[in-house]
Curated annotation (Swiss-Prot):
It is found in: Cytoplasm. Residues 93-170 form the RRM domain. This is Embryonic polyadenylate-binding protein 2-A. It comes from Xenopus laevis (African clawed frog). GO terms for biological process: nuclear-transcribed mRNA catabolic process, deadenylation-dependent decay.
């Protein structure tokens, strides 16, 4: 007995299989997920190119928490490069604050030193690997006389810890801060007023008369 298969004109077997695949909800979900992953990859790729174009610094060892440019206005981000003279001028208006509580913020430090004068910038130093605060900070004031007022805050209590406040030093490249110069005492091994390896001028003094017999103690 022969079996007939009736087919409608214009309908191919391949077309029917494709239509069934499109109607499969699981296949639709997989395709939608793949499309979302591709869009996410393109978005991340675009963000990576944007970071390279603006030159984001990868070093978090010195993190500028807050920079107060004007009254009530704060900006975040790395400071702009400064010349040597500008750094000297800023250091003369800045103080070092040690033993700072790790949970202390720039706002906390500003409130603690607000009586000393107007503050331009507060920098909290962080570890370059972990990003955690190192426990000290620098505060830049608008006026030099504010440094003297801030030094009087030495050994005050900040967030339960006694802090250390000192004027900020200017580190000059190639010059050691421990080299104070000046006289350092008599050099070792000095035998006369001539350097090692040089013979004294003239004949050495040997006394008068003939030498007597040598008396050995033993």
């Amino acid at each position: 007995m022969s079996e007939r298969v009736s087919e409608e004109p214009g309908l191919d077997k391949g077309d029917g299989a494709e239509e069934c695949e499109l109607d499969d909800p699981e296949l639709k979900a997989i395709r939608m997920r793949v499309r979302e992953m591709e869009e996410e990859a393109e978005r991340l790729k675009g963000l990576s190119g944007q970071d390279k174009s603006i030159g984001v610094s990868p070093r978090p060892c010195m993190k500028l928490i807050h920079s107060k440019m004007t009254a009530g206005e704060y900006t975040e981000g790395p400071p702009r490069p400064l010349s040597a003279e500008e750094k000297k001028e800023i250091d003369k208006r800045s103080v070092y604050v040690g033993n700072v509580d790790y949970g202390g913020t720039a706002q906390d430090l500003e409130a603690h030193f607000s009586s000393c004068g107007s503050i331009n910038r507060i920098t909290i130093l962080c570890d370059k690997f972990s990003g955690h605060p190192k426990g000290y900070a620098y505060i830049e004031f608008a006026e030099r006389n504010s440094v003297d007022a801030a030094v009087t805050m030495d050994e005050t209590v900040f967030r339960g810890r006694t802090i250390k406040v000192l004027p900020k030093r200017t580190n000059m490249p190639g010059i050691s801060s421990t080299d104070r110069g000046g006289f350092r005492g008599r050099p070792r091994g000095n035998r006369g007023n001539y350097q090692r390896g040089q013979r004294p001028r003239g004949r050495p003094f040997r006394g008068c008369g003939r030498p007597g017999p040598l008396n050995h103690p033993y």
